[in-house]
């Protein structure tokens, strides 16, 4: 149903419609006006009940061509016609007509609360709005239509006659729905309204639960200290009241807050407390949340936490808990991707975004897309990372917290490519991360800034940024500690590594550069592999690093590598791809041209790797770059395009001359 007043009606169309309507008799015009206010499809028995007009009046309207019959229904032939008629109904008559429609729907046993709430509001019937709108909101939320749910709560709150207790409950519901759909500032305002009203009413249970919900909304605003304060206050209010579902939710929320500040042992203990209360009470939302948090903290302390998060997802899916489903998908993708288990992460991104888009879970969609951009950056798919990050930042309603990943990605890739504007992104990212106060956000942003300074030839400033990351890394996982250790060493900081390091970082800390590079390559992280090779003094490794940087389109790191090679007295250093690349009609590097020639010859990636003495991971990256530069969706399309441009023949001529 489209509410009257929405949409644009061209003047010419309006005049044509109203000219037809003016030719109707009085009773028939009443039928037309009521039909326009009912909606796009009109039950014939409802229309007759509301207007009391004889069938002849309906026949006259049908004869005008504005309405058409459809069994027991009537419908406007064009929505523009309905809008034109509805807007022409005099304002003083509309409330009475909507009141009659509302009464007619009631007599017919209408169970559509959203429809009833619409007509009740238009009729000025506040008790009816307060009856139907909250019911419509809860039904919409249960169906995953969270924007509609928020709109219905807002409709109910427009009734000034609502008593404080009723209003408090409505604000609570609204705050939750607004947070889910990404309207964070409005969610905080609604939560604060609810909190004041519950305190005024002296309802401690609802006060505590509202504080817990408010903590969620504050999290999405990037207000880290306030997140913890609200969660702690919720527990303080609810603990004296005994083991309730509300207390289980509060423990789960405080556990999540502790996790975000890298207090993982406390987070795990609180999550287990929440589960002990939630499971016997059947508080499945609290159970899912607690399992999700416990899994994340276990993963970040060296344990295998994904099993807990998968159980959290199963619990939420089976109970139809949209918000908890979105959180579990987001956490699964984050954990797998942060551990560089990209193949395992992929399904949770695809399934998660699909679910979140379908259920209006904008908060978790934003989180998934941000983490996806980081994964694309880590795997050398920079064009895709830039495209996704740019698309995210174009969203006007994205909160500061969910701007962090795209800001980080765009800043660091611009720095690597030697493009202008890197600091614009990295400065904003640092401001947001520092305000949030969470190590999970501070560390990657400070390391991105360390890299940017290093690439710009400012090692002292780079070391300072790496040390700022190290300052908050005590509770981080081995991957974050490893990244911090690598940049401390690379930038010349005297600080030693903290604790156990994960994956290839252990090899780097032990100066096993070749092994580290192979490990990065096996994980699909070509830029990290190149950095590991750069950190050695071995000529062959440095040449390989230079080739990788060049192939990735990272001229700043390539130039630093050339400078290091010159300092080591290495001769015959490749000057870079610029002249050859510019001469090539598609801008392919030398290695990419070799890969293209072998693609055209029908070689598989494994065969190309054997021919060029490269790893299959490196070849995968080169093939992706070639397809992108040719604008080809497949290898066969790339070969056909190269043949049309005459590139294959040129390759064969060189082979025959050699």
Pin down the residues of each PLM region.
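Short secondary-structure boundary elements
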Residues: 1-163, 173, 471-479, 485-487, ...
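Tandem amphipathic alpha-helical repeat scaffolds
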Residues: 84, 135-141, 169-182, 206-224, ...
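Repeat-based scaffolding regions
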Residues: 93-216, 229-238, 508, 515-521, ...
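Inward-facing hydrophobic residues that define packing positions of alpha-helical scaffold repeats
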Residues: 58, 98, 102, 120, ...
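Helix-turn-helix DNA-binding segment
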Residues: 524, 563-566, 575-633, 637-658
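Amphipathic alpha-helical segments of tetratricopeptide repeats
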Residues: 63, 137-138, 154-158, 192-202, ...
């Amino acid at each position: 149903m489209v509410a009257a007043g929405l949409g644009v009606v061209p003047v010419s169309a309006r005049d044509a419609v109203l000219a037809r309507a003016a030719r109707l008799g009085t009773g028939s015009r009443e039928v037309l006006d009521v039909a326009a206010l009912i909606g796009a499809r009109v039950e014939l028995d409802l229309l007759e009940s509301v207007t009391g007009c004889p069938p002849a009046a309906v026949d006259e309207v049908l004869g005008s061509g504005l309405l058409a019959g459809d069994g027991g229904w009537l419908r406007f032939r064009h929505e523009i016609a309905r809008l034109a008629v509805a807007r022409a109904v005099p304002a003083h008559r509309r409330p009475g007509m909507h009141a009659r429609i509302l009464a007619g729907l009631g007599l017919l046993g209408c169970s559509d609360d959203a429809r009833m709430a619409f007509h009740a509001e238009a009729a000025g019937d506040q008790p009816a709005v307060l009856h139907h709108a909250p019911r419509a909101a809860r039904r919409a939320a249960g169906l995953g239509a969270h924007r509609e749910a928020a709109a219905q709560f807002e409709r109910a709150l427009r009734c000034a006659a609502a008593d404080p207790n009723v209003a408090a409950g409505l604000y609570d519901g609204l705050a939750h729905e607004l947070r889910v759909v990404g309207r964070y500032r409005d969610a905080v305002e609604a939560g604060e309204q609810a909190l004041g009203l519950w305190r005024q009413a002296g309802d401690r249970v609802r006060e505590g639960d509202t504080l817990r919900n408010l903590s969620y909304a504050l999290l999405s605003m990037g207000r880290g200290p306030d997140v913890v304060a609200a969660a702690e206050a919720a527990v303080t209010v609810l603990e004296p009241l005994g083991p309730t579902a509300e207390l289980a939710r509060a423990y789960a929320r405080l556990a999540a807050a502790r996790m975000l500040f890298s207090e993982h042992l406390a987070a795990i203990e609180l999550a287990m407390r929440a589960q002990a209360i939630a499971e016997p009470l059947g508080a499945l939302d609290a159970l899912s949340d607690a399992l999700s948090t416990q899994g994340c903290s276990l993963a970040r302390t060296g344990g295998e936490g994904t099993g807990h998060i998968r159980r959290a997802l199963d619990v939420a899916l089976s109970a139809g808990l949209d918000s908890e489903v979105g959180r579990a998908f987001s956490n699964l993708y984050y954990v797998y991707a942060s551990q560089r288990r990209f193949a395992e992460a992929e399904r949770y991104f695809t399934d998660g975004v699909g679910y979140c888009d379908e259920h209006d879970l904008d908060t978790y969609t934003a989180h998934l897309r941000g983490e996806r951009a980081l994964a694309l950056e880590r795997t050398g798919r920079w064009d895709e990372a830039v495209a996704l990050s740019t698309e995210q930042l174009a969203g006007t309603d994205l909160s500061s917290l969910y701007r962090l990943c795209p800001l980080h990605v765009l800043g660091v890739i611009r720095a690597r490519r030697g493009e202008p504007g890197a600091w614009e992104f990295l400065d904003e990212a640092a401001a947001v991360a520092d305000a949030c106060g969470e190590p999970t956000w501070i560390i990657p942003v400070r390391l991105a800034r360390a890299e940017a300074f290093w690439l710009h030839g400012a090692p002292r400033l780079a070391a300072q940024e790496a040390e700022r990351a190290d300052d908050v890394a005590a509770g981080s996982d081995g991957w974050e500690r490893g990244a911090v250790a690598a940049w401390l060493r690379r930038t010349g900081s005297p600080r030693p590594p903290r604790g156990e390091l994960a994956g290839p970082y252990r090899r780097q800390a032990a100066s096993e550069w070749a092994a580290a590079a192979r490990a990065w390559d096996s994980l699909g992280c070509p830029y990290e592999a190149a950095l590991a090779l750069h950190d050695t003094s071995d000529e062959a490794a440095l040449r390989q690093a230079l080739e990788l940087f060049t192939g990735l389109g990272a001229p700043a790191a390539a130039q630093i590598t050339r400078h290091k090679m010159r300092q080591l007295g290495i001769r015959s250093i490749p000057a870079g791809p610029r002249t050859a690349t510019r001469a090539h009609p598609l801008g392919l590097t030398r290695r990419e041209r070799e890969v293209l020639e072998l693609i055209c010859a029908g070689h598989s990636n494994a065969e190309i790797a054997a021919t060029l003495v490269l790893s299959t991971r490196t070849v995968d990256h080169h093939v992706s770059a070639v397809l992108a530069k040719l604008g080809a969706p497949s290898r066969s399309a790339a070969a056909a395009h190269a043949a049309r441009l005459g590139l294959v023949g040129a390759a064969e001529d060189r082979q025959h001359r050699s």
